[in-house]
Structures are given as structure tokens and as C-alpha cells.
Amino acid sequence: MARFFRRRKFCRFTAEGVQEIDYKDVATLKNYITEAGKIVPSRITGTRAKYQRQLARAIKRSRYLALLPYTDKHL
């Protein structure tokens, strides 16, 4: 049988030394939401709890300011 290699999860924000996650940085925030617009959980992304809270807050703020969509484009 074939063995599957799982990539080790790590927190990108800790590795880069980020102090605060900016809600205006839409390119970074898009990596942490699904196609349907949901916030991806930390058990999938490997983000530490401190940064997951900041990430959720930043995504919600950018949604409120219409920088990110609440849902996908359903017609």
C-alpha cells in the first residue's frame, strides 16, 4: 500500500513574525476563507489560536467594509 505524506502544519504568522493581522490585506485574508466564503478552521490551516482570533476579526471587519464577500457569487 502507498503511504501518504502529510505536510506538517505550521503557523505562517508566527514564522513571519507578524504582530497584528491587517483587515485591509485582502490577498492574505483570501487564503483563509473557502470558496463559499466561510472562515477556514485552524485545525486545517495550522494557525495558532492567537492569530486565528485576529484572522477571524480581520475577515469580519473586511466583510463589513465590503472588501471581502460574505458568500460566493450565486446567481
UniProtKB/Swiss-Prot annotation:
Task: Spell out the PROSITE patterns in the cross-references.
Answer: RIBOSOMAL_S18
SUPFAM superfamilies the record matches = Ribosomal protein S18
Record InterPro entries: Ribosomal_bS18, Ribosomal_bS18_CS, Ribosomal_bS18_sf
Q: Which domain of life is it from?
A: Bacteria
Keyword list (alphabetical) reads: Ribonucleoprotein, Ribosomal protein, RNA-binding, rRNA-binding
User: Per the record, GO CC terms?
Assistant: cytosolic small ribosomal subunit
* Gene Ontology terms: biological process: translation
- State the Pfam families in the record: Ribosomal_S18
Q: Which GO-annotated molecular functions does the record name?
A: small ribosomal subunit rRNA binding; structural constituent of ribosome
Task: Provide the assembly information.
Answer: Part of the 30S ribosomal subunit. Forms a tight heterodimer with protein bS6.
Per the record, the similarity remark reads: Belongs to the bacterial ribosomal protein bS18 family.
| PANTHER family per UniProt | 30S RIBOSOMAL PROTEIN S18, SMALL RIBOSOMAL SUBUNIT PROTEIN BS18M
Functional description taken from the UniProt entry: Binds as a heterodimer with protein bS6 to the central domain of the 16S rRNA, where it helps stabilize the platform of the 30S subunit.
Protein name in UniProt? Small ribosomal subunit protein bS18
Name the gene for this chain.
rpsR
